[in-house]
Amino acid sequence: MNLIQELEKEQLDKLATGKTIPDFGPGDTVTVNVKVKEGDRTRVQAYEGVCIGRNGGGINESFTVRKISYGEGVERVFPIYSPMIDSIKLVRRGKVRRAKLYYLRGRRGKSARIVEKQDQRQTTTAAAAAE
């Protein structure tokens, strides 16, 4: 491992302590709690939407979240290890077959919906427990 990779790994370990980042990908609905500074006080603002892609790797990894706010599509890019992110929560998993969901930009209403992923193991264990 070269020197830059070692330094990045050290910084990544330092930034990741105390944070739990769920395993999510494109199509998943996530809630990102962002620290917003207004004057001299800081508050936490929730931003919920569909993850339409993840970029980069390691310490430079980021993800894009898209939501519809008052009829307008709003996209925001968050670095995963940003100190401005308070927490990331996975709301639901989506069933998609693409790594980047940029086609959602041109869609509205029902055509922009993403089907929820049904985990086969959870349904079979729930059915077995019911019997």
UniProtKB/Swiss-Prot annotation:
Keyword Ribosomal protein carried by entry: yes
Signal sequence annotation: none
Xref: Pfam families: Ribosomal_L19
Keyword Ribosomal protein: yes
Gene Ontology molecular function terms on file: structural constituent of ribosome
CC annotations in GO: cytosolic large ribosomal subunit
InterPro entries: Ribosomal_bL19, Ribosomal_bL19_CS, Ribosomal_bL19_sf, Translation_prot_SH3-like_sf
GO biological process: translation
Record key words, sorted: Ribonucleoprotein, Ribosomal protein
Task of the protein: This protein is located at the 30S-50S ribosomal subunit interface and may play a role in the structure and function of the aminoacyl-tRNA binding site.
HAMAP family cross-referenced by the UniProt entry: Ribosomal_bL19
Family according to the record: Belongs to the bacterial ribosomal protein bL19 family.
Name this protein carries in UniProt: Large ribosomal subunit protein bL19
Organism for this UniProt entry: Afipia carboxidovorans (strain ATCC 49405 / DSM 1227 / KCTC 32145 / OM5)
Gene (UniProt): rplS
